[in-house]
Amino acid sequence: MSLLTAFDTTGKSVVSKAVSKLKEFGVEYEVHVMSAHRTPDAAIKFSAEAKKNGFGVIIAAAGMAAHLAGVLAAKTTLPVIGIPCKSAQLDGMDALLATVMMPTGIPVATVAVDGAANAAILAVEMLALSDDSLAEKLENMKADMEKGVAEKDKAMQAKVAEL
């Protein structure tokens, strides 16, 4: 099972967080630079062929007008996850609104501004619906997070007891 990560050049630094998470789960991926505005034909072709090329999910990171995820979603039946990226203007709010406000029939699952790690985890959750080993890795990740919180709580209780 594979995953396609596509992004506009504004999302390059953000995407490294998604790549790290995908590697952590052992998910195959490709990374490409494309733009909804500067290379629309290439983006549309890429998206239209993604499923037949073996991809299971598309992650698209873009800033400012952030139309990449929507353009990709328009030409595929694969799930598309959008990562709105911060830019010098509006601190990423423009990208967030552009990514989340999609017309009926062209959904884009949207994570937080610069939320690449969660985008990767969401993609893994989608892929895990048909992959038991990924599902087990997700369960282990959540169990580890739970242990971490329990350890922090124990440390806090010890500090409070000393007051």
Regions found by a protein language model. Give the residues of each.
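Glycine-rich phosphate/diphosphate-binding loop of Rossmann-like nucleotide-binding domains
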Residues: 1-38
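Short glycine/serine/threonine-rich phosphate/pyrophosphate-binding segments
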Residues: 11-16, 39-42, 62-71, 90-93, ...
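Active-site-proximal loop->helix
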Residues: 19-24, 44-47, 91-103
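Alpha-helix C-terminal capping segments
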Residues: 21-24, 70-79, 102, 128
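Active-site rim loops that border cofactor/substrate pockets in soluble metabolic enzymes
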Residues: 24-58, 154
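Glycine-rich phosphate-binding loop
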Residues: 46-84
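Short, glycine-/small-residue-rich phosphate/pyrophosphate-handling segment
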Residues: 89-136
